[in-house]
Amino acid sequence: MSEKIEGIIDDLLNVEENADAIAIIGKDGQIVTQTENWNVSNDLEIINELLNEKLALGEKGITSLSIQGIKYMIVENTEERKIGTNITGKGHVLICPIPIGGPGALIAYVNPRAGPRDLLFNVQEYAKKLINLI
């Protein structure tokens, strides 16, 4: 992993205290990096399926995904973002495709004390910084 990518992750974690873990998926569908407290390697297949899903107007698509054994209901699925919420209060996942609608992603685990939309702007901005790095 490059120092630039590491710096972007560190900056995001410093700006967003409710982002407890980060993973970055490259445009090739492989893990570029992830924070030590989160391992998405066993869940890459469903994450990549979600990232590569192209929905027509009115189509539902994937309705849930599990990461590290925690199930998240997909509450928003657009080219700009995928938001999943655990209905038992175990937090949220915010997936920002890189580039918008693309196969890479910045994925943030949002702790239960915050809502995913509280972090949305910053996570999307940091995802844009990764476009030419992954």
Swiss-Prot record:
GO terms for cellular component: cytoplasm; cytoskeleton. It is found in: Cytoplasm, Cytoskeleton. Pfam families: Profilin (PF00235). It comes from Lokiarchaeum sp. (strain GC14_75). It comes from the Archaea. The Loki loop (specific to some members) becomes ordered on binding to rabbit actin. It is not clear if Loki profilins 1, 2 and 3 are from the same strain. InterPro entries: PFN, PFN_sf. Residues 55-62 are annotated as: Loki loop. One of its GO terms (molecular function) is actin binding. Belongs to the Asgard profilin family. Binds to actin and affects the structure of the cytoskeleton. At high concentrations inhibits spontaneous rabbit actin nucleation. This strongly suggests this archaea has a profilin-regulated actin system, and actin-type genes can be identified in this organism. Inhibition of rabbit actin polymerization is reduced by phosphatidylinositol-(4,5)-P2(1,2-dipalmitoyl), a soluble form of the phospholipid phosphatidylinositol, suggesting an unknown lipid might regulate actin-profilin interaction in vivo. This is Loki profilin-2. Keywords: Actin-binding, Cytoplasm, Cytoskeleton.
